[in-house]
């Protein structure tokens, strides 16, 4: 099966550690953990997550956790046809700010799979607002 990759970058007005921690907080608007009515989140290596959003459930397992620079987890939903895909998020110091880069690989090249780009951009347009600034879109 052919797969695609989604990459979204944002510059956020806060240091990497603060951005990293906020991204893993289910109370922070603009994170994938802050959707729907049911969230189970265990953000550590081999920790699992389950999200029941408005339309479809998502689940996965954290495979890397290197605070404050990088995290990686699997991502499974009906939109990935039940197959594991991989989400890697990096947080790099960029002057006084943080360059946050999200790369989602292994997404099926289907209409539902291609919808992940819109979804991640939605989150990463809201998330920077928690730090007192709107998004500054790079890609």
Task: For every predicted segment, state its role.
Residues 7-8, 14, 25-57, 70, ...:
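Short beta-edge strand/loop motif at the mouth of beta-sheet-based domains
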């Amino acid at each position: 099966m052919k797969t695609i990759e989604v990459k979204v970058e944002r510059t956020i007005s806060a240091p990497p550690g603060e951005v990293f921690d906020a991204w893993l907080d289910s109370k922070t608007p603009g994170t994938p953990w802050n959707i729907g009515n049911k969230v189970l989140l265990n953000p550590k290596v081999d920790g699992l997550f389950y999200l029941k959003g408005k339309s479809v459930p998502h689940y996965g397992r954290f495979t890397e956790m290197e605070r404050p620079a990088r995290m990686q987890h699997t991502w499974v939903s009906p939109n990935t046809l039940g197959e594991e895909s991989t989400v890697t998020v990096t947080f790099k110091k960029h002057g006084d700010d943080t360059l946050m880069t999200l790369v989602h690989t292994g997404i099926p090249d289907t209409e539902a799979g291609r919808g992940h780009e819109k979804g991640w951009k939605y989150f990463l347009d809201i998330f920077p607002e928690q730090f007192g600034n709107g998004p500054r879109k790079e890609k």
